[in-house]
């Protein structure tokens, strides 16, 4: 026992020499001369001397691993922090990566703590500043081109796409078209302006000038195509159905085919076009088409412009009263539109009516004649529920600076536009042809403002009109489109219009 060296444990002072001696004993544990009782004596001593063990197999840092964010537990590249100083740097890295994680070009090493920060925010920590993302047609192109805000790292909002020309809302066969849906958005701040008028009064030209074009531009580039010289010479019409155009300021313009058009009637008669079974005569079908379009505009528009090129046609006012009578009722929130005439006048919607006298002469701008025109229109529309007065005034435009506000006692929504012509040619033709060179340079007397200034004042007054609620619920642009499609379907199936057509035949 004394030769084996295990009889006296105190002789081996340090555990290191004891380990070297054990490494040389390669025999099985049963052959140890000290016995199993002596083997159990130094095991507790080995555990008490833990500083000599290698750091690999120890798991004393396990609580630090459990305290790490869940997004970093599965990362094999990160090691367990040993010192206390490195563990304090982790929250600082998380805060910085949350601010810079959304920027393009962030390396994956920095973007990974951002996911942990976003999870912390979902667990209860609120973000310091909300981020709103509005999806539109131009967002993808802006994001691909790199239009990124340097402060918050988000794609900048781009303006709505500008339409280059009008598109069809109702085609020449009186069928509804869905192509306008892609230009509409989910917002409620919109204004719908429609126009009706006889053939050749300048409806498409006026709507183009109010929406997107200027008088000095080429008419071939207008958003609503105007009559060409060839069409004017053969007495034809340019517009068919209903054309749609929306500006970037979210103003919807609806241009229509001429009402009671003789060219459309001539086309039906000469081309042997088959009429619908409910109409027997071509002129009845043309009149019912005009009534359907007008009744539709009275239901879905905030402002309806009635254009004339002379004052005045009494049949036009009779037509307006008939369309008002056959206008579909405002549908409630509980049921769809049936296209029948409404019974409750208090809940019915009626738009603003603007009587636009296009191609006005110098005599019509005379204050005395202007007063007579207002009195005549007021008497003709006295029994109408349409809002034909109180929302537009030529006296507010400083066109007649010498007239008092009370001069037009029965002022209606009437506006006068002079003949559209080149101002330079107008000055040369109307200038004095005397021998004195001074008079030859002076412009001729017009008796009214220029055409461009009148169009600008008309646009300002129309865009400033009140935007009443079209239905019992607030409509967005897309909701208005579906609402208009439902109204158009109700107008075509209207029992009141069918009964009126039967009585006309």
From Swiss-Prot:
Keyword Manganese on entry? no
Query: Which pairs of Cys residues are joined through disulfide bonds in the record?
Result: none
What is the organism field in this record?
Salmo salar
Q: Where is this region: Disordered?
A: 1-127
UniProt family annotation: Belongs to the SMG9 family.
Fill in the subunit field for this protein: Component of the SMG1C complex composed of smg1, smg8 and smg9.
Which gene name belongs to this protein? Answer: smg9
Which BP terms from GO are recorded?
nuclear-transcribed mRNA catabolic process, nonsense-mediated decay
Name the job this protein performs.
Answer: Involved in nonsense-mediated decay (NMD) of mRNAs containing premature stop codons. Is recruited by release factors to stalled ribosomes together with smg1 and smg8 (forming the SMG1C protein kinase complex) and, in the SMG1C complex, is required for the efficient association between smg1 and smg8.
- The answer, when asked if Glycoprotein is one of the entry's keywords, is no
What does the UniProt keyword field contain? Nonsense-mediated mRNA decay
Protein's UniProt name: Nonsense-mediated mRNA decay factor SMG9
Amino acid composition bias (Basic and acidic residues), ranges on this chain: 37-51
The source's superkingdom equals Eukaryota
Record InterPro entries: P-loop_NTPase (IPR027417), SMG9 (IPR039177)
């Amino acid at each position: 026992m004394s030769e084996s060296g295990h009889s006296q444990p105190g002789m081996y002072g340090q555990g290191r020499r004891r380990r070297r001696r054990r490494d040389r004993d390669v025999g099985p544990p049963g052959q140890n001369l000290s016995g199993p009782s002596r083997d159990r004596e130094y095991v507790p001593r080995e555990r008490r001397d833990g500083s000599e063990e290698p750091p690999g197999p120890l798991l004393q840092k396990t609580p630090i691993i459990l305290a790490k964010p869940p997004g970093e537990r599965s990362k094999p590249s990160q090691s367990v922090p040993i010192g206390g100083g490195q563990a304090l740097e982790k929250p600082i890295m998380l805060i910085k990566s949350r601010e810079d994680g959304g920027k393009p070009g962030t390396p994956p090493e920095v973007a990974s703590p951002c996911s942990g920060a976003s999870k912390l925010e979902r667990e209860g920590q609120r973000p310091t500043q909300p981020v709103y993302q509005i999806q539109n047609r131009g967002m993808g192109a802006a994001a691909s081109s790199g239009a990124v805000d340097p402060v918050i790292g988000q794609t900048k909002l781009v303006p709505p796409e500008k339409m280059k020309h009008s598109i069809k809302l109702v085609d020449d066969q009186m069928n509804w078209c869905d192509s306008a849906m892609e230009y509409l958005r989910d917002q409620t701040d919109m204004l719908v302006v429609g126009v009706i008028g006889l053939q050749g009064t300048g409806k498409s030209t006026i709507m183009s000038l109010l929406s997107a074009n200027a008088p000095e531009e080429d008419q071939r580039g207008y958003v609503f195509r105007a009559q060409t010289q060839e069409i004017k010479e053969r007495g034809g019409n340019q517009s068919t159905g209903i054309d749609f155009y929306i500006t970037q300021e979210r103003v919807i313009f609806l241009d229509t085919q001429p009402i009671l058009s003789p060219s459309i009637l001539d086309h039906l008669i000469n081309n042997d076009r088959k009429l619908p079974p409910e109409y027997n005569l071509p002129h009845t079908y043309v009149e019912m088409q005009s009534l359907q379009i007008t009744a539709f505009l009275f239901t879905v528009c905030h402002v309806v412009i009635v254009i004339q090129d002379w004052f005045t046609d009494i049949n036009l006012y009779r037509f307006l009263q008939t369309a008002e009578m056959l206008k579909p009722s405002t549908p409630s929130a509980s049921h769809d539109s049936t296209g029948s005439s409404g019974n409750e006048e208090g809940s019915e919607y009626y738009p603003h009516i603007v009587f636009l006298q296009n191609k006005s002469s110098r005599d019509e701008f005379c204050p005395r004649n202007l007063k007579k025109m207002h009195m005549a229109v007021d008497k003709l529309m006295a029994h109408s529920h349409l809002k034909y007065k109180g929302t537009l005034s030529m006296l507010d435009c400083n066109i007649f600076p010498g007239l008092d506000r009370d001069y037009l006692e029965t002022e209606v929504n009437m506006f006068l536009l002079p003949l559209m012509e080149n101002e330079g040619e107008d000055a040369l033709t109307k200038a004095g042809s005397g021998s004195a060179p001074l008079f030859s340079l002076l412009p001729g007397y017009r008796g009214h403002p220029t055409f461009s200034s009148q169009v600008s004042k008309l646009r300002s007054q129309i865009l400033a009109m009140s935007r009443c609620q079209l239905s019992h619920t607030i409509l967005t642009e897309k909701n208005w489109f579906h609402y208009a499609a439902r109204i158009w379907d109700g107008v075509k199936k209207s029992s009141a219009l069918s009964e009126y057509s039967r009585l006309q035949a």
